[in-house]
Amino acid sequence: DFSQIICCALNKRGVEWSSLGDEVCTQTLSKERHLIISDTSKDCDVNSDKFETYLRLHKITKVVVLVANSETFDIKVKRNGAIKYFHMPVDLSELSHAKSFYLNLFLEQFLVKHVNLPCDDPETADLVALLCKLAGSNASVLINGPTGTGKEVVAKLLHAKSARKDEAFIAVNCAAIPENMLESMLFGHEKGAFTGALQSNVGLFRAAHSGTILLDEISEMPLTLQSKLLRVLQEKVVTPVGSTKEIAIDIRVLATTNRNMLQEIQANNFREDLFYRLNVFPVSTCALKSRPLDIPAIAAHLLTRNVSENGTPKILSTEALNKLVQHEWPGNVRELDNVIQRAEILSCANEIGHTDIVFDNDLTFRPRNTFEALNSKLDVKVG
């Protein structure tokens, strides 16, 4: 039934849930609680005083009612928008891209503030299950995968599921910070340690104390700094630039890379000892083309991302969904994000059609040709 399907989808995303009346689970859930009523519109009167009392008693902040598309459900009291209902226009018992899209579109109504990994592919669901187990450890994790496959989302999920979730999560792009500034940014510096150091700086490692730090694109870190990072990981101390004092830190270190690290070691671009210190538990993210079942779920997430609290996201037609699933996605999720944003702009209706799906290789970087490619979509004359 609806309930089993929803619970299965929540499990795939690594989202905790509890059944009504499960007081033990209710006490352990986050402060912002949601109630899902599925396929029970005839049995549950959300307008009753009894229901109102139940919401206050359990500190439930939002109610989402899932009903079949053929049903009508009149909610007389909106509770300032706290009660919403979502019509399911497809049969959830059928396996289809449309079913996956609408189910995940429904889940996005109340998962906006919850860190989770939109997915429907069995391998991705297995990855989420692994991450939930791994989150309980303080071990370093090296996340490897092609650009645009969600490595930072994986890192955020590890942090959100850990005991450190209420502490800082700091991401550092090792490729974006100049080499002469990276050591100071990471480990801090004392006042006067170098020209321009007008005041002391604690550094990102100390700023993330008790929390998690993500070293994004760790393979781009200069060799001279790798040895200092190795000592930080081994001894759990940092030494600010211009100081001889070691400062203890309690921190979990995650790292990402899109390179083959063994090849980087052989080319003397990365220290072997640092690799093994980071690679306590390796995790890999796959290219989007190898997990097409995730595409409807990710598309639903992208369409609801910028919608206001009481707004309605656009939907994808069956033809548009099929077009997305059949694409190769060389740019992975980043490319999918671009295509979805483009489709939202081009679509004049609430439903995005297959003609609104324009891939990057359909466009050029020449303004005239780009305008001509979009001209039929926008229905305007160009120059």
Set out the residue ranges of the language-model regions.
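Dynamic helix-loop-helix/coil hinge segments at AAA+ ATPase domain boundaries and subdomain interfaces
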Residues: 105-126
